[in-house]
Regions:
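PRY/SPRY (B30.2) beta-sandwich protein-interaction domains
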Residues: 1-232
């Protein structure tokens, strides 16, 4: 039988957009939550179906595996896709769109600041022990900050990071959209609706929406139509 999401007629959750995929990549599967790139040796970029310009939002991703050749070459965060939504790599030095991305294998945070790429090093990176764990992304557009989590805890030096250009964009009404880029890895996203990732704790946001492995931080909400109508 086909996979089915836990949406209802009155509440739909964000998924990965199958027509919003860069670099000849395979469209997401399993309810548009699973990214299959292992063995391709190329950058594969994905984007969500919902965007936000204000409020506080949470989603998480599940580390299905780790490339034996390249490690966890996975970036997660947000993008505004102002110009080139089919960019092969969201972190490309030629891509002037605004990003806020955490690189799992490098422990780096990437944004654009003015006309230059800004790289913040010293965040915790994730090694082989990360397989089977979750990375959380908490976007705070009220204060133009982002925090990244690993296995339920804030990543070292990964709290309240400035959004730089992305925050400027959302202040101007340009939508920030969930963005994930992988290289030679398979990866699963959980926006709170259907996901193939294993959920053992079934945590929801403060409005009672979403099913997450780790509870969203206080004041952060799942990307779904009910929450967007009230908060986004």
């Amino acid at each position: 039988a086909a996979d089915q999401a836990t949406d209802t007629p009155t509440n739909n959750f964000c998924t990965l957009n199958p027509i919003f995929v860069g670099n000849q990549s395979t469209p997401p599967s399993d309810g548009a939550t699973y990214m299959s790139d292992n063995g391709t040796n190329q950058d594969v970029s994905y984007a969500g179906t919902m965007g936000v310009t204000k409020g506080k939002w949470y989603y998480e991703t599940y580390i299905d595996m780790r490339s034996t050749s390249y490690g966890l070459t996975i970036y997660v965060g947000y993008h505004t896709f102002k110009n080139n939504y089919r960019a092969n790599a969201y972190w490309s030095s030629t891509n002037q769109d605004s990003v806020a991305l955490y690189g799992m294998h490098t422990g780096q945070y990437w944004t654009w600041n003015g006309g230059s790429r800004s790289v913040t090093s010293g965040l915790g990176d994730i090694g082989a022990s990360g397989v089977g764990k979750y990375v959380g992304i908490a976007l705070n557009l009220d204060d133009n900050q982002i925090t990244f989590y690993y296995d339920g805890n804030a990543i070292t030096n990964g709290s309240n990071l400035a959004l730089n250009n992305l925050g400027t964009d959302t202040d101007a009404g340009i939508f920030a959209i969930p963005a994930i880029s992988v290289y030679d890895n398979n990866h699963t996203v959980n926006f709170g609706g259907y996901t193939k990732a294993p959920i053992s704790s079934a945590q929801s946001d403060e409005n009672g929406y979403g099913t997450f492995e780790h509870a969203p931080p206080t004041g952060y909400y799942a990307l779904c139509t009910k929450n967007l109508a009230e908060l986004g």
